[in-house]
Amino acid sequence: MRACINNQQIRHHNKCVILELLYRQKRANKSTLARLAQISIPAVSNILQELESEKRVVNIDDESQTRGHSSGTWLIAPEGDWTLCLNVTPTSIECQVANACLSPKGEFEYLQIDAPTPQALLSEIEKCWHRHRKLWPDHTINLALAIHGQVDPVTGVSQTMPQAPWTTPVEVKYLLEEKLGIRVMVDNDCVMLALAEKWQNNSQERDFCVINVDYGIGSSFVINEQIYRGSLYGSGQIGHTIVNPDGVVCDCGRYGCLETVASLSALKKQARVWLKSQPVSTQLDPEKLTTAQLIAAWQSGEPWITSWVDRSANAIGLSLYNFLNILNINQIWLYGRSCAFGENWLNTIIRQTGFNPFDRDEGPSVKATQIGFGQLSRAQQVLGIGYLYVEAQLRQI
């Protein structure tokens, strides 16, 4: 049985809406907030006054406005903690610092690392944090970590990390908080992409999916504007949908998963086997083959890679067709290094998808299924993981 909403709950909801708008807009006046929130300016004034008393927002004078203090600009209180957003693998760390408003500070960085053990990986994260703390000594800087594989966002444990040489869980959150004395939040790298789209793409649908086609293939769903993780935090494992029951064995132990056909790691394995069968004069070293070399070979029209890329796109399209039948999410964004295969690769995916059986000719075209490349920069993508703190704050109001 559902209960009615009392005045306190309505006030809580409205405060969250205004804070969400300020995190998205970064700066806004009352009239803009009233228009976006679809309430009156006096109602917005009352909410802002309460949020200001709680030191969550501040008002600054805007010289371009001429109607007094009430027309000033409002923003999230800048005195709050900053966040160091990291996307972490055993071979690289991408980082972007953000202030209390989740606006980027400093430059986006990509660092190559060598982490053969969990301890080595944690050490690299610590070094990265210490370096940024020295750059911004006047601010408390918390950590937001995006890690590939299965992650428990509540305990902050990396349960499986496919690219890593180890197979044991790593208590990332606990160990870093104990060592650094700061807050640490951890989630999956596909959740990072979903949060980035949710908070930084103002034209985003309430329901959408991001798919990361890279070393592996992962995805994250946003349903009714909320990240769907599942009770065991294993949702979005589209890379382990089976496309060929008699196919190659996958790292998960099953046969013919999408990752064994369509991921970059699968394409590189096929390329290494093929290159080893070629004359010594072949320019590419199969043991040192890089993703950049693989993509360059495709761009130059090498037939051996062209057919594999087409096959991978067909497999992704087939998986998406099944996915559309089940969830009826009509906006899908593709991210990852495989997007460098370009429009032909994307069009093959779309053709294999065919059509969403739930699309109807009489429906509005804006609601038709859309599959495309994500448009956020890499810095914006990594910044997405920082919104874990924003969503945690909104839950606690």
From Swiss-Prot:
Q: What protein am I looking at?
A: Uncharacterized protein YphH
Pfam families linked:
ROK
UniProt cross-references to InterPro entries, sorted A to Z:
ATPase_NBD, ROK, WH-like_DNA-bd_sf, WH_DNA-bd_sf
Name the domain of life.
Bacteria
Single Gene Ontology MF annotation: DNA binding
Kindly list the biological process annotations in GO that this record carries.
DNA-templated transcription
Q: Which family does it belong to?
A: Belongs to the ROK (NagC/XylR) family.
Organism source for this protein? Escherichia coli (strain K12)
